[in-house]
Curated annotation (Swiss-Prot):
InterPro entries, per the entry: CbiM, CbiM/NikMN
Function: Part of the energy-coupling factor (ECF) transporter complex CbiMNOQ involved in cobalt import.
Transmembrane stretches, start-end: 31-51, 68-88, 100-120, 132-152, 160-180, 206-226
Native species: Moorella thermoacetica (strain ATCC 39073 / JCM 9320)
Main location (coarse class): membrane
Gene Ontology, cellular component aspect: ATP-binding cassette (ABC) transporter complex
Family: Belongs to the CbiM family.
Listed name of the protein: Cobalt transport protein CbiM
UniProt GO molecular function: cobalt ion transmembrane transporter activity
Membrane as UniProt keyword: yes
Keywords associated with the record: Cell membrane, Cobalamin biosynthesis, Cobalt, Cobalt transport, Ion transport, Membrane, Signal, Transmembrane, Transmembrane helix, Transport
Pfam families, per database record: CbiM
């Protein structure tokens, strides 16, 4: 039953993505960054891609049944980050969708899933670009997931509820993606008066009006999706050690996953 529901969910998510129209959004556009900065961000994300590949390979090898959930996390990221809403100055803002995957599989796996999502969007939706793939991956698929996963673990360690942990992870992971993108643009294009700081504040201000409510909405949506997974796919969440289950001595999973 769950697999049938998951396939239907994936189909609907991809159908929604196909209807998304290209627009200038917060992803840095093709050719916008100078060559030296574009190359710099590729070098920065390369170790995360290597780590992410190892993490995904280990997870899938340990439990092949998690492939469907991994695909769902990627589809969720693809669709949410492709839903562009009008912002000021004729640009667009959009959710990122990285919080769910970060909570489920950790930040390493999301560096790969997010990178694949950004590559497809650059090729199919004219969203972002190939030359700026490194920069966009660092902001949305590295910083965002690390912040999301770190907050999730912190809230859970402080005995916070699961819905609160997921909400904060998705919301602040989204916001930090845009803070990072603003910093990347500011480093490449510092203001004549005020330098990098002034330029960063300017870029952040452009998107703040729409991005804050979008991030909060993404937080609530991610909680809803997580609750559905907890209801209809509890076994996989137990395998990932997200929800309590039987220990290995009791016949449960060993839970040795690289996150």
């Amino acid at each position: 039953m769950f697999r049938r529901t998951t396939w239907l969910t994936l189909y609907l998510l991809l159908a929604m993505a196909a209807l998304a129209r290209p627009a200038f959004a917060m992803h840095i556009a093709e050719g916008f960054l100078p060559f030296n900065w574009a190359a710099f961000w590729f070098i920065v994300v390369l170790p995360f891609w290597i780590w992410g590949l190892r993490s995904i390979r280990h997870t899938v090898k340990s439990n092949p049944g998690l492939k469907m959930l991994l695909g769902l996390a990627g589809a969720y990221t693809f669709v949410l980050s492709a839903l562009k809403l009008p912002s000021v100055t004729g640009s667009c803002s959009h959710p990122t969708g990285i919080g769910l995957g970060a909570v489920l599989f950790g930040p390493a796996a999301m560096s790969i899933l997010g990178g694949i999502v950004l590559l497809f969007q650059a090729l199919l939706l004219a969203h972002g670009g190939l030359s700026t793939l490194g920069a966009n991956t660092f902001s949305m698929a590295v910083v965002g997931p690390f912040v999301a996963y770190g907050l999730y673990r912190l809230v859970r360690k402080l005995k916070g509820s699961m819905p609160l942990a997921v909400f904060l992870a998705a919301t602040l992971g989204d916001l930090m993606t845009y803070v990072t993108t603003s910093l990347q643009l500011a480093l490449a294009f510092p203001a004549q008066a005020g330098g990098v700081v002034a330029s960063m504040l300017k870029f952040m201000g452009i998107f703040a009006v729409t991005q804050l409510p979008l991030a909060i909405s993404e937080g609530f949506l991610t909680v809803i999706v997580f609750n559905l997974l907890a209801t209809y796919n509890k076994n996989d969440l137990e395998e990932l050690s997200i929800m309590p289950g039987k220990t290995a001595a009791e016949g449960g999973p060993s839970r040795q996953y690289s996150r």
